[in-house]
Amino acid sequence: MAGRTTIEWVPHPELSAAHAAYVVATRTPCNDKKIEQLLVQPVTEVNNRLFASAVDVSQFWQHYLLQIMSDVSMEKACGLALLSAGENELQVDQTTKAIVNRLGDARLAFLHRYPKLSEQLELRARPLKERWETFGPGLLNQVGKQIWRDNPPDEWWMKHVTAAMVQPMRGGDGGCDAASSRLWLEAVLTDVEPGVPEVLRVAWLVTSMAIDSYARETSNDLSLMLPWSLVSVPLVLNAGRELELVRGEQLPVSEAMQLWHFGDAEIAETVSQWWTNQTDSTAPMPARLKQLDEMLPPRVSGLSAEDAI
């Protein structure tokens, strides 16, 4: 039951710095132009070395963030991220030494701009934390009912989740790592989109981790991982509607997926159509997931909430 899930809200200055570097390095629109100016030189030098090493730059930054979120040291996080991005094992130490100082420069520039970040994040996280305490258990209970018809497995919901709060760079963002039972969120003070409250982003990330863990542990059919991930969006939105957090006859699937940086407009339209078609279905969830899988464009692959980083 959802009541067994507790979230520990933790301000995370180190992840904030890494997230800012990631945003600048990947040329993602950034709300803090000053930070963009401060970090562009060191992260560009990091990227240049990554390109020279012929590794997957996007994979490097994603895995680097996951390691920092798990409180791994910068140097070790860098080495592990390089391996995940395809660096030759014999070259990892050399490449790490070449870029870790630049990462350190970016970190120091960020923390100098936000010298009291830990205290600020604690204050910024408070409204969302209070909103989650009010609506979170109800949202997860509603999601569980939709999937399991009032009888979710005992281990469906994670008992403990750590939520790492970071300085907003994109006006609302988040991601998760089911393996470590951790998620991260930009500590925005108000809802970015009133029609899709931020508390629903939290519910979506917690649900995504539950789906990921359960599917990997119980199913050999990993082809259903993608539809499982996509279904998490309307499930959470519909739960929000039950609690009067979402208004209107049509679920704002497209708006939510855009806000959560998950999928594109074509995928969102397909998910919305599938949701409408299966509303009155009595078929088991796996059967309905296969229907969604058949509706998806062939080019879609490897998408999950954990890629929302």
Q: What does each model-found stretch correspond to?
A:
Residues 52-140:
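Long, mid-chain structured domain cores
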Residues 2-69, 211-283:
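Post-HExxH zinc-binding segment in Zn-dependent metallohydrolases
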Residues 116, 124-135, 190-194, 220-228:
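Conserved aromatic-histidine-acidic binding/catalytic patches
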Residues 277-309:
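Long, compositionally biased intrinsically disordered regions
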Residues 93, 111, 115, 175-178, ...:
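Alpha-solenoid helical-repeat scaffolds
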Residues 181-217:
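Active-site recognition of the HExxH zinc-binding catalytic motif
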Residues 112-179, 238, 242-251:
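Auxiliary, metal-adjacent structural segments of Zn-dependent hydrolase domains
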Residues 134-144, 199-203, 229-232:
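Well-ordered, non-membrane alpha-helical segments in soluble/globular domains
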